[in-house]
Each structure stands twice: as C-alpha cells, then as structure tokens.
C-alpha cells in the first residue's frame, strides 16, 4: 500500500486514538532531551527522509528536545570511489588516512549535514548544522584500537579516527533553549587542531550521557538486534551482549553501535533503543506510542 493510500485509509476515530495514545508520552517526555543517531536507509530513501524530518519537527513542537547526530557512510563511499579510493573498515571503524579524512569532512560536514538541516527546515523546524569543530565542542584524540583476542597493548593504527576526550554541552543547550534543533556531524578536533573522524554511534552515545538525555535512539537497517536465526531480540543485557559478541552474532558496524548503546545505558541515559530506520515514522512509533520498533538495551 502506498503512503498516500495508507493515510487515506486511516479513519477519524483511529486518528483520535493515535493522538490519545501519544498524550501520556508527550507529558512524560516534555522538555526532555532525546538524542537520535540518524543513518542507514532512512538517510537515502526520499520518503523515509521526509518521514524522519517531520518526526523530528513534531517532537520539537510538542515540547521534546531532539538532538540529531548523523552518519553518511554511503555518501562517503560514493565520493571515495570518484577519487579512486576504496573504503576499509576494522571492527566497524573506517580506516581514515589524510586523504580519506578530507573526503569524510567534506561529505559529513558539508553535503550530508546541510541536506538534513534543509529537510528539517522545510518540514517547519529550525535546524542548525554543526561539527565538533564548532566552538571546539567535541574534543578528541587519536584512537588506539585494541586488537580483538590479542594481548593488551596490541593495537591497530586506523589513521585519523578519533576517541572523544570531552564534550562541552553548552552550545547544544543554548540551541535547545532557543527552539533550534542541533544536527551534528561526527567530526572532532584535537588539542593541536587535528581533525578526527569519529564513529557517529559513539558520538551519539557520549552526547546522550553528557546531556543527561532521557532517550538514545539509534536508527539502523535491520529490525533491531537479531540473533543468528534472524529473530528480533527485543531486550538485551550486558551479559547477553557479551555472549553475542563472543559467538560472532554481533560484528562489523554493529559493534560500535552496541558498545555505544551499552555505555550510555550504564552512564545514566534512561532508555536506549536500536530501531528499524526503514519503518515509516519509526521515531514517533518508538517515542510516542505503546509499540516499540526495535531492541532496548538494558544496563543490567
């Protein structure tokens, strides 16, 4: 069924029921911060992009404070291919030499960030695009990545990939108070002005901790976290996550996502969700209805 015919089939009574269901959640989350990691198909499908922008604007209009952190992997790969480079990943992190860093900053801080800002503004919001270099609000240092199943100190050089050292929340708080919607590209700055590519899931998780967010919502291209049989796991504890990593169920790009989600849950973020970004209006379904659309990460 098309989006148009689906909308036309919703009766006035059902619309009223949907609004009534949302009311207690609007009251509960009023003036609360919701950090959203935006990525995957939701960033490439035109209809899903429109749904995402309208969801974010609606959340702001009913009194929540959405903060968007975005990725841009497919767009980075496209530009790398144009300059004759191929992306390389280690444990879900993009290996970033100097030339790749230029491409990453151009794509994330320019093309992708401004497209998201424009989408939200066209939907009626007031979005402001940022990177961690703005006001130096995301400070970082070179990430020394520990090899899996190797002795401590056995590290992999992944180039200009950054590890967050500090986040100054004052800029984001200032924008929230002014009814703006921050849209953040995951680029950090070093003490000597170095530029660092930081995994967007990691930035979203750390930002949620610093802002004392009510929720962290990570969009992905799957229904959530799946077991080896492809079944959705609606809730995960740290012990279960360790088991899934050990048996290889969780790997690649899901590793930083899960790690970020678990750290946030352990450090004060009240609820953390990995949801299906391919579902229309997935944010509203997760935040303002009784029916979640993914996996909830528990701190214990």
Curated annotation (Swiss-Prot):
SUPFAM superfamilies: Carbamate kinase-like. Gene3D superfamilies: Acetylglutamate kinase-like (3.40.1160.10). GO terms for molecular function: acetylglutamate kinase activity; ATP binding. GO terms for cellular component: cytoplasm. Pathway: Amino-acid biosynthesis; L-arginine biosynthesis; N(2)-acetyl-L-ornithine from L-glutamate: step 2/4. It is found in: Cytoplasm. One of its GO terms (biological process) is L-arginine biosynthetic process. Belongs to the acetylglutamate kinase family. ArgB subfamily. This is Acetylglutamate kinase. It comes from Azoarcus sp. (strain BH72).
């Amino acid at each position: 069924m098309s989006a148009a015919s689906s909308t036309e089939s919703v009766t006035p009574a059902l619309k009223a029921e949907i609004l009534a269901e949302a009311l207690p959640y609007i009251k509960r989350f009023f003036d609360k911060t919701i950090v959203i990691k935006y990525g995957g198909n939701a960033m490439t499908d035109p209809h899903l992009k429109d749904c995402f922008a309208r969801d974010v604007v609606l959340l702001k209009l009913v009194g929540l404070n959405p903060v968007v952190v975005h990725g841009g992997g497919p767009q980075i790969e496209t530009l790398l291919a144009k300059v004759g480079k191929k992306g390389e990943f280690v444990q879900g992190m993009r290996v970033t030499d100097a030339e790749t860093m230029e491409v990453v900053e151009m794509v994330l801080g320019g093309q992708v960030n401004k497209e998201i800002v424009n989408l939200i503004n066209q939907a009626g919001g007031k979005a402001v695009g940022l990177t961690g270099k703005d006001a130096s609000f995301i400070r970082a240092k070179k990430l020394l990545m520990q090899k899996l199943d190797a002795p401590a100190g056995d590290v992999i050089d992944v180039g200009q990939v950054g590890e967050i050292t500090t986040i100054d929340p004052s800029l984001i708080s200032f924008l929230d108070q002014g009814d703006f919607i921050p849209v953040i590209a995951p680029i950090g700055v070093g003490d000597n002005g170095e530029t660092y590519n930081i995994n967007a899931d990691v930035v979203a998780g750390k930002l949620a901790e610093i802002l004392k967010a009510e929720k962290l919502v990570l969009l992905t291209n799957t229904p959530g976290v799946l077991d080896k049989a492809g079944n959705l796991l609606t809730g995960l504890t740290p012990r279960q996550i360790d088991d899934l990593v050990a048996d290889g169920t969780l790997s690649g790009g899901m590793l930083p996502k899960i790690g970020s989600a678990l750290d946030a849950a352990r450090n004060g973020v009240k609820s953390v969700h990995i949801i299906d970004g391919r579902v229309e209006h997935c944010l509203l379904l997760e935040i303002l209805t009784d029916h979640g659309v993914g996996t909830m990460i528990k701190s214990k």
